[in-house]
Amino acid sequence: MSSTFARVRRSTALLVALFMVLATMALAGSPADAKKPDPPGQLVQLQLLAFNDYHGHVKDTDAGNIGEDPSGGGEYLSTKLKELRQGNKYTLTVAAGDLIGGSPAFSGLFHDEPSVESLNAMGLDVSSVGNHEFDEGVTELLRMQDGGCHPLDGCYFPDEPYAGADFQWLSANVVNEATGETPLPPYWIERFESIDVAFIGMTLEATDTLVAAVGIEGWDFLDEAETANALVPILKAQGVEAIIVLLHEGGSQTPAPGEINACEGISGPIVAINDALDPEIDVMVTGHTHLPYNCLLEDASGQPRIVTSSYSYGRVVSEIDLVLDKRTDDVRRDLSTAQNHAVVRAELTPDPAITKIIDKWTPLFDVAGSTPVGTITENINRGGAPTGSDRGVESPAGNLVADAQLWSTSANGAQIAFMNPGGVRSDLTYAQSDGEGDGVVTFGEAFTFQPFGNTLLTFGMTGAEIVSVLEEQCQPAGSSRPFLHLGVSEGFTYDLAKTIETGNCTSVSVTNVQLDGVPLDMNAVYAVTANNFLADGGDNFGTFATVAGPRLDGGNDLLALVNYLGTFSPVSPPSTDRVNELN
């Protein structure tokens, strides 16, 4: 062999080898072959259907709209869940709290037993506990879980005692001060083929500022992220890699009207909680703010995490399609997706199972709730558009309640009354809802409007303390709602300037405070009425709780409203010029 031929052969071989290397690199870099397909049978599909803030909306009468479309209510939510489950081998229905409490009269008059019965019929599997589950205290929450007759009202159907919830409520971050025990399980594990999936239930840490203190005495509400993170190694020690948090806390965003899948400018507590959560937690199902969103938020390791919220009152269902990998027993985030579905009544047929529950309770409700208590001349609405969406503005509804409470406690010398916006749960609408006649307000409607059964208290406050309360409308940084606008009684006025930046109230100024046209004396003492929730410092109005001196009992807040409507009918919407917003 000549040396020239050998050199040619060697050169040719090198060229062939180089070509093969380049070809292999090109193929490896092509999208079609960037990743080998998963071997058959290694992936498990798990559908999660999620909702939050049901608030006892068994009937559809006042569940509300999505855009212009009437939506929600138990009968239609149940049908939507059944529709979405079709074709899915593995499916769970989960919730993020506030399933009961703050409910319309149809459920609330009966301590939300109709609500739990409807949730059982829908096939709910597991839920976190929200702040409203504590409205009647820990003992009543345990009755709602386990069953039994109400300690005061007894059994509504003697031959059919309340059976409790078929689903499991979870609350990992609520602990007994003395024992450190939780009132309900902290987590729940379900197996799909060979893969265990854990659900951690979380109540918002601020619950002790949102419910009456007497019902939660002796219980601590811990940081959500710290509690969840502490459970991760406990779950992993049991072989669990796929971890979902059901969290009753949320955020805010600014979508277009009717848009339920956006995640635009997401802000609020959920952002900081997401940042603080262990990256081992794969999904967060959230609630509390009554807003829909469908987000992919980066966890602390930079990986995308699904975070959803599904509005309120059964108006939206979040469908989370999880892909589980048998090789890791974990969630394949790159393959998992989420979508929010509207529960539009016109597109659905009521579920007969829920209709049967409604029919069962209707005769009792007709007796208790259909009695007329007064009349109105037009709608008396909450703040925002749609109504009830903004607790940071003055509203006719809030001022009406304050007027009623001032009038009702006048015998105790009351001069000013304040009402928290979250205590007004619906509008009083002029159009008839159930055949009672236009303008007629029934006891059931009054209950739905103001359902918590608080006690009115009248006590002395200095002018300076009153101004401090008004400044506390500007909520602490990180609160779910940056500003909570108190309803104020007629004759009380002031000027207000506030700044809201990136979902937080950053400044507030209260000036020109007057009572019946006379400037408030900062050193003088005035008789103020508030419900016991506010008087105990609820909603971060801490000044109320520090006021010294006696507190005079003014009776039940709902009865104050009912008697006011009966005395002054027809009642017109109070003005919303009691507070002059300067900016």
Kindly give the residue locations of the regions a language model identified.
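Acidic, metal/ion-coordinating pockets
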Residues: 33-347, 392, 397-404, 417, ...
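Bacterial N-terminal signal peptides
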Residues: 15-26
